[in-house]
């Protein structure tokens, strides 16, 4: 790939509905960055939570833009609002939850971008994880180096 810089302006993102009220505005697709990084802004209704999971091939970063989020990274539990930044290294079980009472927004990055391809594939399939069976989700996640290791820990 001939690497070039580029700018994604508001409104130019690829927007995907992950679940009712939960959207991802994909700012950087994995293939646009020569697999270096994948980035998106997520809108998460109150109570939205991920299962305890890990990524074998990528590190994850989450920056809270609005709302209040709780994090479990390894054995540590934390909660923070706007300006909070969480780093979730590869092979460390982690999860997050919008623990506030309002819709929250967060910016995510995966580096390298391989782990983010799971979202790109679900978007192309038009099948959010919430509409898939547990074995389907596990197979898709495994394909991109993810592993679900437990339910949401909150």
What residue spans do the PLM features occupy?
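Short, conserved beta-strand element in jelly-roll/cupin
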Residues: 39-45, 54-73, 109-111
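Conserved hydrophobic/aromatic beta-strand scaffold that supports enzyme active sites
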Residues: 26, 39-43, 61, 77, ...
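A hydrophobic, small-residue-rich beta->alpha segment in the mid-to-C-terminal subdomain
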Residues: 105, 116-128
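Short histidine-centered beta-strand/loop micro-motifs
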Residues: 28-30, 50-56, 97-99
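A short, N-terminal "cap"/entry segment at the start of jelly-roll beta-barrel domains
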Residues: 1-37, 124, 128-154
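Short acidic-glycine-tyrosine-enriched beta hairpin
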Residues: 7-9, 15, 75-93
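Ligand-binding loop in jelly-roll beta-barrel domains
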Residues: 33, 70, 81, 90-116
């Amino acid at each position: 790939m001939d690497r070039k810089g580029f700018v994604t302006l508001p409104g130019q993102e690829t927007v995907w509905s992950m679940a009712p009220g939960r959207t991802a505005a994909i700012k950087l697709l994995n293939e646009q960055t020569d697999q270096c990084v994948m980035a998106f802004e997520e809108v998460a209704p109150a109570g939205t939570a991920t299962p305890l999971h890990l990524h074998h091939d990528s590190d994850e970063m989450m920056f809270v833009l609005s709302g209040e989020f709780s994090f479990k990274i390894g054995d540590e539990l934390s909660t923070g609002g706007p300006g909070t930044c969480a780093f979730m290294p590869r092979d460390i079980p982690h999860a997050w939850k919008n623990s506030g009472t309002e819709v929250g927004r967060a910016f995510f990055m995966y580096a390298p971008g391989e782990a983010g391809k799971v979202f790109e594939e679900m978007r192309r399939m038009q099948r959010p994880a919430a509409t898939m069976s547990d074995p389907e989700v596990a197979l898709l996640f495994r394909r991109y180096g993810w592993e679900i290791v437990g339910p949401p820990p909150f």
